[in-house]
């Protein structure tokens, strides 16, 4: 399934902006899990579709949640 030449994929919208979430909360582990790969890595902005502001907040929130043992650093 190759993309046609000259055709660009549609840009994903930031889910935090759509839901009008001002700050990303590190205690919301269910939401944060959507932005982590099965290997435990944080998804990049071009894949997740987040805006730059919320991607920065998301990164800090995931790192805090890992330290508080709400999210794993790696998979077993």
From Swiss-Prot:
Q: Name one GO biological process term.
A: translation
For this protein, the record's InterPro entries field holds:
Ribosomal_bS18 (IPR001648), Ribosomal_bS18_sf (IPR036870)
GO annotations of cellular component type: cytosolic small ribosomal subunit
Q: What does the UniProt keyword field contain?
A: Ribonucleoprotein, Ribosomal protein, RNA-binding, rRNA-binding
- Presence of the UniProt keyword RNA-binding in the record: yes
Q: Which molecular-function annotations from GO does this UniProt entry contain?
A: small ribosomal subunit rRNA binding; structural constituent of ribosome
Spell out the coiled coil positions from the record.
Answer: none
Q: Is this entry keyworded RNA-binding?
A: yes
Q: SUPFAM superfamilies of this UniProt entry?
A: Ribosomal protein S18
What this protein is reported to do is described as: Binds as a heterodimer with protein bS6 to the central domain of the 16S rRNA, where it helps stabilize the platform of the 30S subunit.
Subunit and interaction comment: Part of the 30S ribosomal subunit. Forms a tight heterodimer with protein bS6.
Which family is it part of? Belongs to the bacterial ribosomal protein bS18 family.
Question: NCBIfam families recorded for this chain?
Answer: S18
Q: What is the protein name given in its UniProt record?
A: Small ribosomal subunit protein bS18
């Amino acid at each position: 399934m190759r993309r046609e030449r000259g055709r660009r994929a549609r840009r994903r919208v930031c889910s935090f902006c759509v839901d009008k979430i001002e700050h990303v909360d590190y205690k919301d582990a269910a939401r944060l899990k959507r932005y982590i790969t099965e290997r435990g890595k944080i998804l990049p902005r071009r894949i997740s579709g987040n805006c730059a502001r919320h991607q920065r907040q998301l990164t800090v929130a995931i790192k805090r949640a890992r330290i508080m043992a709400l999210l794993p650093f790696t998979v077993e």
